[in-house]
């Protein structure tokens, strides 16, 4: 007899992780496979980041961390957001988690109630709708085709918003299409969202440095909706640190406090050693991003 919870029974397995596992199994059998499943950088974690982690181990930096992460890492993230994105946050507006994936899920779980609608532009990362369903919400899919560069328009967004809409998940640069919203395109979406203050934006910016232009624009830059935007980012893609599992949100303090409350009851703070590595990554960020990302553009 299946006695699992209803929420788990309606949850689909991660398609990307299943594909990755299958790819690894075929490779182990000697099959030549090109793995296009998970977003795994081809380069290695930069040496200065690894050295910071080694030092943390030698210094016995191995205790439980505060739930939102150590202040040093959160302050490094605040500086990154200011220097790279021109955005002003405080350490109290940052919450670190076990990867950006958990950060997305934390935010959805903190905001979404039973029956709330969450707008998800398609094509989308496969976990978005499943996370919404896990929170008892309803994913509302907006399809953006190749003729519009896989990016939704303000008219599409306006048409999708209802009294039940709680959030929009916006991924730019996009996983899986690679499409990047321009500042002008984001301004158009922001103008629509400003008319609907009950709608929050979960801005997944984990691929911000994986672009051909090298220029990333955040929807959080627009003052009229800034307080309704929750940025999600982390070290996995830009610094080849997928296995270190450090992500974060930046947003209104009341949402960050709610996420901390939630995270405190199931995973607590992220790995202490990984936090020291991430702190080193953000402290010297742009210096060590440019060369690997240049190779990705070739």
Tell where the protein language model's regions lie, with residue ranges.
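N-terminal small-domain helix-loop-helix segment of the aminotransferase-like
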Residues: 2-99, 106, 281-284
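Short acidic capping loops at alpha-helix termini that bridge into adjacent secondary structure
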Residues: 88-94, 114-117, 164, 226-229
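Conserved PLP-anchoring active-site segment centered on the Schiff-base-forming lysine
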Residues: 110-132
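A short helix-loop-beta submotif of the ANL/AMP-binding
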Residues: 134-140
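Active-site phosphate-binding strand-loop segment of PLP-dependent enzymes
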Residues: 145-213
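Conserved core segment of the aminotransferase class I/II
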Residues: 222, 227-287
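Residue-level detector of conserved catalytic or cofactor/ligand-binding positions
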Residues: 285-298
């Amino acid at each position: 007899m299946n006695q699992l919870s209803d929420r788990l029974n309606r949850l689909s397995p991660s398609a990307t992780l299943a594909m990755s596992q299958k790819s690894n199994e075929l490779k182990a059998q000697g099959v030549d496979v090109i793995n296009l499943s998970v977003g795994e950088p081809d380069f290695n974690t930069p040496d200065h980041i690894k050295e910071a982690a080694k030092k943390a181990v030698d210094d016995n930096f191995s205790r439980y961390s505060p739930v939102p992460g150590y202040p040093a890492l959160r302050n490094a993230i605040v500086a990154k957001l200011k220097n790279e994105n021109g955005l002003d946050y405080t350490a109290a507006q940052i919450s670190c988690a076990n990867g950006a994936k958990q950060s997305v899920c934390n935010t959805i779980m903190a905001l979404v109630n039973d029956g709330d609608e969450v707008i998800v532009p398609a094509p989308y990362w496969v976990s978005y709708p499943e996370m919404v369903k896990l929170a008892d919400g309803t994913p509302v899919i907006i399809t953006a085709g190749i003729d519009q560069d896989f990016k939704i328009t303000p008219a599409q967004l306006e048409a999708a918003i209802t009294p039940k809409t709680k959030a929009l998940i916006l991924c730019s640069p996009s996983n899986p299409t690679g499409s990047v919203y321009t500042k002008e395109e984001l301004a158009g979406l922001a103008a629509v969202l400003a008319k609907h203050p009950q709608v929050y934006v979960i801005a997944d910016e984990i691929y911000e440095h994986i672009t051909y232009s090298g220029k990333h624009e955040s929807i959080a830059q627009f003052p009229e909706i800034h307080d309704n935007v929750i940025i999600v980012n982390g070290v996995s893609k830009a610094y080849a640190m997928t296995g270190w599992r450090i992500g974060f949100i930046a947003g209104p303090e009341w949402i960050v406090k709610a996420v901390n409350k939630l995270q405190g009851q199931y995973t607590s703070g992220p790995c202490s050693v990984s936090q020291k590595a991430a702190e080193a990554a953000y402290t010297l960020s742009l210096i060590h991003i440019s060369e690997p990302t240049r190779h990705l553009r070739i």
